[in-house]
Amino acid sequence: HKKYLEKMIENGNAYVSKEEAKDGSGVIKEIVRFKNPNIDVTFNDLIKGEVTMNTKDLGDFVLAKNLNEPLFHLAVVVDDFEEGVTHVIRGEDHVSNTPRQILIQRAIDAPTPIYAHLPLVLGPDKLKLSKRRGALPITEYQKQGFLPEAILNGIAFVGWNPGTEKEIFTHDELVEAFDLERVQKSPAVFNETKLEWFNKEHMNKLPYQ
């Protein structure tokens, strides 16, 4: 990551800023900030379509604590670039991160990957699923006897549909049918009763022993 920071500083896209530590110790630290051009950044999202965001409100955001300690935005951009990542598929709560990352991509001459921001998955209370609100990990459903293919089938239908009446899919059929462009834009609600139905249907397809 250091060589990319040095490149951005050399090109005028970033600069070293001497700032007092926020812990009140009075220590002066040399952090690296991105020189924000305050422009509109537009990208095409496979789910949301064309998205335009102005970077003015982002300010000169921090890239690294110092030349040897990169922070999140620089790290993910560099890692994705060096690993040849072509698609970034993540939750829509990361949409606001995208302009920063595109600015960094341009500054280090990295291609911008194709983005797809998935809608959040909500619980029956219409709040974001989380452990604190009782959401179970997939492994817990497996312990309760849910078949892996039923879990996969059920999760695939949370916010997506194939455009047909067919609901029961095998793993291979889902791979063939799944298309990010058919993922809904609004948040999806996880329905455990529906997952139980998927499990029952997959159970019925098991060979009799």
Annotate each predicted stretch with a short phrase:
Residues S96, I108-Q209:
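Catalytic adenosine-cofactor/nucleotide-binding cores of aminoacyl-tRNA synthetases and other
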Residues K3-K131, P137-I138, P162:
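Active-site cores that bind ATP or allylic diphosphates and position pyrophosphate for catalysis
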